[in-house]
């Protein structure tokens, strides 16, 4: 009887470990879709496209005669068009560049950490050509 209980316990633990391993594997392969889920665009605003590593990065803008600029990347699964009106009203004397991550708000490609760094440098270089002060 003791052997039967041990055997049942071992089988139970192996099944639990197998289910846990299967869940971990499923989460690993599904992590991109769980972390990066695009939201819909709030409205249409003036925009420019900046090329980065062969992808087009969509940047919403509010451009005037200012020498100061604000560059903003949205949060996780965020479309920056939601902030356009707020930033334009809050900072009327600054030009605004709201950057959509790859795969969001009209930007092409897939979001990754290395892509984010490359895109940030491409956007900064583009904005720095005209503006002295970038926030």
Residue positions per predicted region:
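N-terminal membrane-anchoring alpha-helices
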Residues: 1-49
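Membrane-embedded segments
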Residues: 57-130
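Glycine-centered tight beta-turn/hairpin loop motif at sheet-sheet or coil-to-beta transitions
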Residues: 52-56
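A generic structural signal for short, solvent-exposed coil/turn residues
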Residues: 27, 41-44, 51, 65, ...
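Alpha/beta-hydrolase fold nucleophile elbow
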Residues: 131-135
């Amino acid at each position: 009887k003791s052997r039967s209980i041990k055997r049942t316990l071992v089988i139970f633990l192996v099944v639990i470990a197998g289910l846990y391993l299967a869940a971990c594997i499923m989460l690993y392969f599904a992590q991109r879709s769980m972390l990066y889920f695009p939201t819909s665009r709030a409205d249409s605003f003036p925009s420019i496209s900046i090329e980065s590593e062969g992808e087009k990065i969509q940047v919403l803008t509010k451009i005037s005669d200012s020498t100061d600029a604000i560059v903003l990347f949205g949060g996780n699964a965020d479309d920056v068009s939601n902030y356009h009106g707020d930033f334009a009203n809050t900072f009327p004397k600054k030009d605004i560049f709201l950057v959509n991550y790859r795969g969001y708000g009209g930007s092409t490609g897939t979001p990754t950490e290395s892509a984010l760094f490359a895109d940030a440098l491409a956007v900064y270089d583009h904005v720095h050509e005209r503006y002295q002060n970038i926030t």
